[in-house]
């Protein structure tokens, strides 16, 4: 998978900018605040329909503008694809080869991408919501139906929460309505749990192998998906309906939904100890690096091709051994795009070196 050309219009600090890319390693060089990360964000948004930095599309528009437009030419298994994403009048329009997509699920996963930045450390150090978001974003690239499941589940969750907030003191009418919503939570939630569990298993096996190489076999990495307090899939699915019934009174008392995949978590462990609680900063960075590279391998196995890799100033956060490991790894990929403040030590590795300054992009010969 490869990007050939990108056009950003009224996106972030870019008024109207086009960029041509090459296979191999592209380095975007420039001082902080010049727009390097915005290029990666534009590519990521174009491929996933989402930003990894903000939740509101309006924040992506250039200052003083109410719209933005993104275009990109890609090669996927020798096929040429033109992707477009337009935000205008508070509406998002996405197109593949000029044909509008009715749903985001028709679009996501057409071209796969893996993004890695220092902020990804939150995947280990942060809360369960950050880890669920990581899983869901990347499952969606493999299985477009997962987006539909998440949207449907969130709607049911909102409806049940609204019902619980009404109170009604556990009347027969309220209980009957809660039971109806519980049926939907059970049906949709079980599919979400199964998808997350399967993806975590694939990721864990590959991540364990890569982490072993990074740590020279000194530590063993495991990733366990915990659903409904269980670390076994069949046990979790069997307990789901029982927990929904048992916790109904407590949910009515607290006026919020307490049971479902919206409260699940993925646990990273080193030698059976919590990496979040006991891992050093270096170990936690190694876990994130291993997980991201494992994700690349999982996509390659499923799609038959490596995804596009975007690296946002990650080398400065890694020690020399891990930095060299990552750079050597990128040699096997079709294309990697990386941001740096200075690329002096990597000019021989790069197939394309670009200078980014004040929203302008130029080649460095």
Curated annotation (Swiss-Prot):
Subcellular localization(s) per the UniProt record: Cytoplasm
Keywords noted in UniProt: ATP-binding, Cytoplasm, DNA damage, DNA repair, DNA replication, DNA-binding, Nucleotide-binding, SOS response
One example GO MF annotation: single-stranded DNA binding
InterPro entries: DNA-binding_RecF, DNA-binding_RecF_CS, P-loop_NTPase, RecF/RecN/SMC_N, RecF_2
CDD domains in UniProt: ABC_RecF (cd03242)
Main location: cytoplasm
Binding site for ATP: 30-37
Superkingdom of origin organism: Bacteria
Keyword DNA-binding: yes
Gene3D superfamilies: P-loop containing nucleotide triphosphate hydrolases (3.40.50.300), RecF/RecN/SMC, N-terminal domain (1.20.1050.90)
GO cellular component: cytoplasm
Cleaved signal peptide residues: none
GO biological process, one term: SOS response
Family: Belongs to the RecF family.
Role of this protein: The RecF protein is involved in DNA metabolism; it is required for DNA replication and normal SOS inducibility. RecF binds preferentially to single-stranded, linear DNA. It also seems to bind ATP.
HAMAP family according to UniProt: RecF
Protein name stated in the entry: DNA replication and repair protein RecF
Classification lineage: Bacteria, Bacillati, Bacillota, Clostridia, Eubacteriales
């Amino acid at each position: 998978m490869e990007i050939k050309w990108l056009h950003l219009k009224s996106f972030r600090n870019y008024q109207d900018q086009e960029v041509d890319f090459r296979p191999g390693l592209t380095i975007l060089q420039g001082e902080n605040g010049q727009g390097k990360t915005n290029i990666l964000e534009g590519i990521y948004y174009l491929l996933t329909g989402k930003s990894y930095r903000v939740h509101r599309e309006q924040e992506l528009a250039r200052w003083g503008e109410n719209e933005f437009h993104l275009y990109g030419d890609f090669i996927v298994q020798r096929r040429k694809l033109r992707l477009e994403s337009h935000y205008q009048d508070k509406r998002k329009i996405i197109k593949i080869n000029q044909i509008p997509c009715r749903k985001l699920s028709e679009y996501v996963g057409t071209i796969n991408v893996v993004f890695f930045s220092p902020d990804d450390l939150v995947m280990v150090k942060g809360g369960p919501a950050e880890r669920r978001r990581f899983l869901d974003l990347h499952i969606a690239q493999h299985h477009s139906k997962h987006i539909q499941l998440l949207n449907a589940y969130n709607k049911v969750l909102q409806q049940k929460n609204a019902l619980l907030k009404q109170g009604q003191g556990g009347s027969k009418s309220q209980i009957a309505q809660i039971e109806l919503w519980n049926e939907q939570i059970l049906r949709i939630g079980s599919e979400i749990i199964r998808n997350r569990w399967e993806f975590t298993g694939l990721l864990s096996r590959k991540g364990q192998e890569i982490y072993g190489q990074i740590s020279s076999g000194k530590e063993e990495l495991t990733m366990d998906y915990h659903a409904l307090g269980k670390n076994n899939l069949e046990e979790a699915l069997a307990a789901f309906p029982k927990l929904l019934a048992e916790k109904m009174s407590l949910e009515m008392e607290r006026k919020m939904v307490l049971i479902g995949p919206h409260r699940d978590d993925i646990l990273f462990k080193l030698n059976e100890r919590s990496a979040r609680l006991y891992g050093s900063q270096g170990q936690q960075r190694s876990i994130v690096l291993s997980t991201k590279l494992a994700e690349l391998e999982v996509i390659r196995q499923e799609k038959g091709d490596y995804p596009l890799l975007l690296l946002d100033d990650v080398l400065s956060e890694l020690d020399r051994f891990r930095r060299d490991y990552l750079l050597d790894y990128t040699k096997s990929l079709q294309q990697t795009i990386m941001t740096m403040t200075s690329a002096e030590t990597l000019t021989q590795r790069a197939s394309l070196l670009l200078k980014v300054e004040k929203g302008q992009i130029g080649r460095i010969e």
